[in-house]
Amino acid sequence: MRNLFRRTSNPDWGSLSSAVATGAAVGGLCASTLGLASGLFDLVASGADAWSLLSGSVVTGLASAWLFRRVRSPRRHETADILTGVTVAFLGMVLLGTLLYLLTGTLTDPRDALFESAAGFSTTALTSLDVDALGRGMLLFRAGSQWVGGLTALLLGVAILPALSVDRELADRHTGTGRRPLAPSGGRAAGNVLRLYAGFTLLLGIGYLVAGAGPLGSVLLAASTASTGGFVGPGQPLADPAVQWVAILGMFVAGASMVILWRIVTLQWQGIRRSAEFRTYLLLLSAGTLLLGWWSEAGGPDEWRETLFTLLSAVTTTGFPMEAVGPWATAAPVLLLLAAAVGPMTGSTGGGFQLFRMLGLVKLARRELMRQLHPSLIARIRIGGVVLSEASVGRIVLQQFLFVAIVVGTTGVVGILGLDLATALAAGVHAAATAGPVRALDGTLLEAASWSRPVRLALVPAMLIGRLALYPALVAIGTAATGIQNRLRLKWRWNALAKERDR
């Protein structure tokens, strides 16, 4: 056994192969650890899925550990290869989650299992499961997959991308007199993010427990709120007003940037006051709640509470379900769809295009209009004291194009597969923004389980790319396409040389 996991003595691997293998191993270890914890929980609760979860998790965990020990890292990894490795790790978690759904018999069709696993790890509030029929172990696995997916998004946005000189302006890295940055280095950033995320989840669990959600319900709701995943367990716990208030506070915090939360914890109030993105976040929530209440004819305190809950669920892309308050005007679901598309603050667990990038686009449009009047104008784009480099501005424009392209492409595919235009557009936006739930024009909640399997399967790529913040996923796709193209070109040249020799 010792020799099995001993480091190989082979020469160092290439940058891409090392990153891909490490990513696959890390993804497998994360998913198998979650499955093992869920299996042990189900075993204690005398559930029927315990041994399937435990056996599948142990086998995949050992295989992942063996692969991790066999990898020999090169002296330097290329940035594109690291992003490819991150994408492979995420895909590995999704695929192993699919396997566990099938092994436990929770889902028998691989397409359903892939959709459910992708929705969980991408924190998309869509599900085809009957939660009342799930055992405790699988309930914990489904909610836990969201929590892991939310942590992946935070580590990617706050620790990994800034360390690779991508979106460095979005990270709190600079030290100074009296300043304690969130991310002075990649390792410190990961540790700070993990502590904040885990502590926030723990506080949410205590809050839900005090509000009366019950032990299991509190764990499920805490994981879903912190990760903005929107999965709700059996028994309709969100029908309780006290539980709703905890969810409202939790969604508000989950939609805020980790930098803001760090500054609150470390009592750095000046940085919070200077944050233009945080002010925009507060303005969006306030104006959106008033508009939604007006368009849904909200009356008493209960209806306004439910209106605020619904608006927060959309803006933060959490996707907790709430029935429409009163008769909805046609503009109400459009408002929620736009709110989900824009999303919360950058550096949060929420999805969507996100507010910092939206502010960057607005500032860019203003600058280009001013240049039409003053062609020699030299102006930098500044957001709340942060000066964006031209590379970051170009990346924001690229991400806007990619987001719109994914929404349009997904809408077209699911429309061809049978959804009407309004539902197809809503499904495309929510998949790309990792949000939910999808609503009809009258505000009625639509169940993903009622859609055909091809429709649900068509949403999976948008969910995965959306959770990976577009850029890393597209870099990975480009790297894979380049590798395939190079191999085909090499094979073509080899065949041409072989034909020359035969002559």
Give the residues covered by each predicted segment.
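Membrane-proximal intracellular helices of multi-pass ion channels
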Residues: 1-503
